[in-house]
């Protein structure tokens, strides 16, 4: 890529600041306008609680609550979304939400099977230590795919973006199920994760399109309720596949079930898109040529970000296994080039990109900036200890696949249940900030208890208790991150701010996974070599790379005790680092706004009431 000179960059900046067609300038101006509007709205609300204050921000030039945006000023995807909202019946919406509920049920079920079986899949290829490396790659691709997918959903439509995501999802599952080596499995996992991320993102955008702000948290909480059910059956099903079939079938079966659950949603959305086309509702919408689309998707920025994160984080994760690799010129060059790519990415996004994937200027808005920081730290914390936690439970606490899954998913269960009840509380109180503030100490406490109760001498109850506490705090945080950023922008911009926070999230996950991989790969082999009996020291690498081999040593033997001690020592480091990152979330939470949600109606589809 050819870098522009400094003077050219300044000229570009001047043009962008003066160009009223700049999408990012519009969004920033919208935020400023909305902030002043909300202040007026709050004053009006005090005078009359019975009157809802509706706000709309349509462009940089003017503000009106009576004039809707012209179709020719809008992208096709937004027009399609509005048409669905304005012309569909409540029954159609109930069908869509029922399908979303089924889809969340299926993908959560599948995710639990995948999580329960992936340690055995990598062990089958002598690659158990690569769990964190695969997680790094998964998180990087999740970060890279969200901004362009959100824009594609605006340019072409929610339906088209959903179908693309579903295709990636299914191809990834097929590759994993048919893999003959760890490289193919990892590649399939990356595609699967990209599709999973896309499906979840488009569903979130759809729910934002069709729900009011006061109901947003409740709708999101209800959509996550399937996780509460599948947590208890997913690990059991995974164990049955492993014991009576193969881990491959535990993955392959979902290539049939997930598309089937999508059919009602696809049918309704396709029908109304066809009606919109037939009635001419899409005529005159903005058209984008390939060059403009290339700019809007910020392909150059995404390549720089993906390359930078991959070169730095994957190098750290892989090189940590052999300390000698830190002096290897190849790894040093990879890290240096990756760092330069990340620097170039930041500069490109700020000074060059017309439609930046990560609009850093938006982070100057306190709520958006604070939520991005919290999302980043939140997922670093989680992935610092999560990648090897499932193996830890089986090795140290002698759990079965089913029991390890139950304990691991106690966090998810508690988090989803908390999100549901939080939605009800917000619906009643119309406020959310103080729930945010209270959740941070709870989350830190849970992380700290994981340090204390990690040893073999503590029974399963001591493993479940921290997961419940972490789940309560984490459920509030995860739910409110999306709600908070959406209160400071109009619905036209839900996709971009949701994608912004959602992009920072997997970057945090990638960093956390790289940290856990670096610690695991550098410390665990040394602990095994130190703790194993002398007659098994030469087998330390084989033991290190296979969960199946680790579990083959029976309870009470010197070998198993040595493996347990090694796991416990490494787990202490992982959870201690995680607790430190969790503590850092105390600072940004105070910058989050605390509007009264009943006065914040940022809905562009106002010709009718929102369906939800």
UniProtKB/Swiss-Prot annotation:
It is a multi-pass membrane protein. GO terms for cellular component: plasma membrane. CDD domains: MFS_ARN_like. PROSITE patterns: MFS (PS50850). It is found in: Membrane. The gene is str1. It comes from the Eukaryota. InterPro entries: MFS_dom (IPR020846), MFS_Str1/Tri12-like (IPR010573), MFS_trans_sf (IPR036259). The lineage of its organism: Eukaryota, Fungi, Dikarya, Ascomycota, Taphrinomycotina. It comes from Schizosaccharomyces pombe (strain 972 / ATCC 24843) (Fission yeast). GO terms for biological process: siderophore-dependent iron import into cell; transmembrane transport. This is Siderophore iron transporter 1. One of its GO terms (molecular function) is siderophore-iron transmembrane transporter activity. Involved in the transport of siderophore iron and so has a role in iron homeostasis. The keyword Membrane applies. Pfam families: TRI12. Keywords: Ion transport, Iron, Iron transport, Membrane, Phosphoprotein, Transmembrane, Transmembrane helix, Transport.
């Amino acid at each position: 890529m050819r870098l522009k000179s400094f003077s050219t960059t300044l000229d570009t900046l001047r043009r962008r600041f003066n160009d009223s067609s700049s999408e990012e300038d519009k969004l920033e101006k919208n935020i400023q306008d909305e902030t002043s509007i909300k202040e007026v709205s709050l004053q009006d609300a005090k005078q009359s609680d019975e009157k809802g204050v509706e706000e709309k921000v349509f462009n940089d030039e003017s503000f009106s609550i009576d004039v809707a945006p012209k179709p020719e000023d809008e992208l096709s995807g937004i027009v399609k979304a509005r048409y669905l909202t304005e012309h569909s019946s409540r029954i159609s919406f109930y069908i869509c939400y029922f399908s979303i509920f089924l889809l969340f049920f299926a993908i959560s079920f599948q995710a639990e099977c995948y999580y329960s079986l992936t340690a055995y899949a990598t062990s089958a290829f002598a690659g158990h230590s690569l769990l964190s490396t695969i997680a790094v790659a998964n998180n990087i691709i999740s970060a890279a795919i969200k901004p362009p997918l959100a824009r594609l959903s605006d340019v072409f439509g929610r339906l088209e973006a959903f179908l693309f995501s579903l295709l990636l999802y299914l191809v990834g599952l097929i590759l994993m199920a048919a893999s003959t080596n760890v490289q193919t499995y990892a590649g399939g996992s990356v595609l699967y994760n990209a599709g999973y991320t896309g499906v979840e993102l488009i569903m979130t955008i759809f729910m934002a399109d069709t729900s009011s702000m006061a109901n947003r948290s409740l709708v999101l909480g209800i959509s996550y309720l399937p996780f509460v059910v599948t947590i208890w059956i997913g690990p059991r099903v995974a164990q049955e596949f492993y014991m009576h079939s193969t881990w491959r079938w535990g993955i392959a079966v979902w290539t049939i079930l997930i598309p089937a659950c999508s059919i009602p949603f696809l049918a309704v959305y396709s029908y109304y898109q066809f009606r919109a086309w037939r009635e001419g509702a899409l005529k005159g919408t903005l058209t984008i040529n390939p060059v403009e689309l290339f700019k809007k998707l910020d392909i150059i920025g995404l390549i720089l970000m993906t390359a930078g994160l991959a070169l730095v984080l994957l190098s750290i994760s892989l090189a940590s296994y052999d300390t000698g690799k830190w002096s290897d010129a190849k790894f040093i060059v990879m890290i240096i080039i990756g760092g330069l790519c990340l620097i170039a990415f930041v500069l490109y996004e700020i000074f060059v990109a017309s439609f930046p994937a990560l609009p850093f200027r938006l982070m100057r808005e306190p709520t958006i900036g604070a939520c991005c920081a919290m999302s980043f730290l939140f997922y670093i914390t989680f992935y610092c200890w999560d990648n090897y936690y499932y193996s830890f439970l089986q090795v140290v606490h002698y759990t079965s696949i089913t029991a390890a899954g139950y304990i691991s998913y106690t966090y998810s269960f508690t988090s989803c249940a908390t999100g549901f009840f939080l939605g009800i509380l917000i619906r009643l109180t119309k406020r959310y900030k103080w729930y945010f503030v209270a959740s941070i100490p709870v989350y830190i406490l849970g992380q700290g208890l994981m340090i204390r109760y990690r040893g073999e001498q503590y029974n399963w109850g001591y493993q479940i208790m921290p997961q419940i506490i972490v789940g309560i705090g984490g459920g509030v945080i995860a739910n409110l991150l999306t709600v908070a950023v959406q209160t400071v922008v109009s619905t036209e911009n839900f996709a971009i701010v949701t994608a912004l926070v959602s992009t920072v999230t997997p970057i945090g996950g990638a960093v956390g996974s790289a940290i856990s991989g670096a610690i695991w790969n550098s410390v665990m082999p040394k602990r095994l070599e130190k703790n194993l009996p002398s007659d098994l020291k030469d087998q330390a690498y084989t033991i290190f790379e296979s969960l199946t081999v680790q579990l083959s040593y029976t309870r009470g033997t010197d070998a198993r005790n040595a493996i347990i001690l090694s796991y416990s020592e490494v787990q202490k480091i992982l959870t201690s680092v995680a607790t430190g990152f969790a503590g850092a979330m105390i600072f940004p939470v105070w910058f989050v706004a605390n509007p009264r949600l009943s006065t914040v109606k940022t809905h562009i589809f106002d010709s009718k009431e929102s369906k939800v």
